[in-house]
UniProtKB/Swiss-Prot annotation:
Disulphide linkage map: none
Descriptive protein name: UPF0342 protein RBAM_010030
Annotated InterPro entries: Com_YlbF, YheA/YmcA-like_dom_sf
Entry's family note: Belongs to the UPF0342 family.
The organism's place on the tree of life at top rank: Bacteria
Source organism of this protein record: Bacillus velezensis (strain DSM 23117 / BGSC 10A6 / LMG 26770 / FZB42)
Amino acid sequence: MAVHFYDAAYDLEKALRNSDEYSRLRGLYDQVNADESAKRMFDNFRNVQLQLQQKQMSGEEITQEEVEQAQKTVALVQQHELISQLMEAEQRMSMLIGELNKIIMKPLEELYGSQQ
């Protein structure tokens, strides 16, 4: 029976890869990487994002200075049209995956009762 779950998961992965949402995300990501200035800006944004996430996950406090720097970085990348479109596409893909996760978790929520 477990093999069936993996087959379904791989089918879902294939469906995501073939979706319009993923195609748009991939296309925008490729465009950002092809533009040297946009790539540098986006890589810097991702590094700031990852550093803050790592600090948060390790229980370290994020300083006000780091918060302000992150806000400046976000404001800067949002001004770049291509990066802004990429971030919107990432958000749509993340929402789609979140909705799929809710569907997958539904049996456990029904079993244990929803906390929402």
